[in-house]
């Protein structure tokens, strides 16, 4: 008989083991057996909680997306300045937070992006993540720019964030998040300078 309250603990344990496995061997070679071994549980536990490896990968991505969302939300709620610039700045910072640019997270995101092109459930998660970033950026730009300009600025900043993140993840060097953020801030300020008085 399972212990009461173990499900959330086991699920998190398996998600963390998945991040570790993808970091060590990549998503393709991150087998159920390896993940279970890293988590210190039997293979059957993964099937019990997630059905299969795809279910576990989807849960791991939902976890990373949740951490990103919670981080950005907390930063926005802590703002003393309610200007669009302040909100855009913390959205940028949240996307380059240590929770998103550590080795296991970066390798899992990269593998997720590649796999999402072939798996509908993961593609859906990718679209949700893309839309969330675009929507948050567009909402803030819309406070000072006409609708079409706000949409264009949001698309550009979202693409820049993703591109800077991708280059940082693939560089093989330590990710210079300060430089990435500065480049994104400069684009943000360029767009905000178009503000209609």
From Swiss-Prot:
Q: Does the keyword Repressor apply?
A: yes
* A Pfam cross-reference name: TetR_C_6
The metabolic or biological pathway listed in the UniProt record of this protein is: Amine and polyamine biosynthesis; betaine biosynthesis via choline pathway [regulation]
List the stretches of this chain annotated as a DNA-binding region: 31-50
- InterPro entries in alphabetical order: BetI_C (IPR039538), DNA-bd_HTH_TetR-type_CS (IPR023772), Homeodomain-like_sf (IPR009057), HTH-type_TetR-like_transc_reg (IPR050109), HTH_TetR (IPR001647), Tet_transcr_reg_TetR-rel_C_sf (IPR036271), Tscrpt_rep_BetI (IPR017757)
Sorted alphabetically, the keyword list is:
DNA-binding, Repressor, Transcription, Transcription regulation
Taking every annotated instance into account, which residue ranges of this chain make up the domain HTH tetR-type? Answer: 8-68
Question: Out of the domains of life, which is the source?
Answer: Bacteria
- Which molecular function term from Gene Ontology is one that the record holds? transcription cis-regulatory region binding
A biological process (GO) of this protein is: glycine betaine biosynthetic process from choline
Q: What does this protein do?
A: Repressor involved in the biosynthesis of the osmoprotectant glycine betaine. It represses transcription of the choline transporter BetT and the genes of BetAB involved in the synthesis of glycine betaine.
Q: Which HAMAP family match?
A: HTH_type_BetI
Q: What is this protein called?
A: HTH-type transcriptional regulator BetI
Q: What is the lineage of its organism?
A: Bacteria, Pseudomonadati, Pseudomonadota, Gammaproteobacteria, Pseudomonadales
